[in-house]
Amino acid sequence: MKVYACLCAAVVMLVMTSRVSEARSTGAPLSACRDMMPQHNATAQTSPPPYTITTDAQSVAPGDSVEVVIAGKLPEDTLRGYLLQARQGDDILGTFSLEDGDVFSQLINCGKPGNAVTHKKHDNKEDKRQVRVRWSPPQGLTGEVVFRATIVKTLKVFWVGVQSAPIKIVS
């Protein structure tokens, strides 16, 4: 009877643990699309982020794309997770695409398919030093956009609203 009770307790613990593990690191929830706040039960950092968001061009035309890179400033500044969008004011614009074989990132729908990109579930040993994606503006867009991100270093250490320099949309 004691063996049965121990076995039941072990199964209950396994189920509870797997649910907790399953709820983490699967990418940004859709509820984060507008305010970009992860559901980590922690407050965003107010210190300058140890990450940069850069592009391979200062302008892009509809029909073309630009590479966007999120990178740590130092080797120890790895990314455990992120949510990246192109914004003009509060509008989330354009479409992202991933490099072939990218096992870290996934496209999500923040109002339109592929207009945001986030991380996939992964082991902490697979945190990244940098992430590379491509972004294409929609037809008819003019003005400038910035790339805005939430970047997660650990579950409780993350920055919201990290921004790139603006890029110009040209026709």
UniProtKB/Swiss-Prot annotation:
Residues 24-171 form the Reelin domain. Keywords: Antibiotic, Antimicrobial, Disulfide bond, Glycoprotein, Immunity, Innate immunity, Secreted, Signal. Residues 1-23 form the signal peptide. The keyword Disulfide bond applies. The keyword Kinase does not apply. Disulfide bonds join 33-110. InterPro entries: Ferric-chelate_Red/DefProt (IPR051237), Reeler_dom (IPR002861), Reeler_sf (IPR042307). Its main location: secreted. It comes from the Eukaryota. Glycans are attached at residue 41. GO terms for cellular component: extracellular region; membrane. One of its GO terms (biological process) is defense response to bacterium. It is found in: Secreted. May have antimicrobial activity. Belongs to the insect defense protein family. This is Putative defense protein.
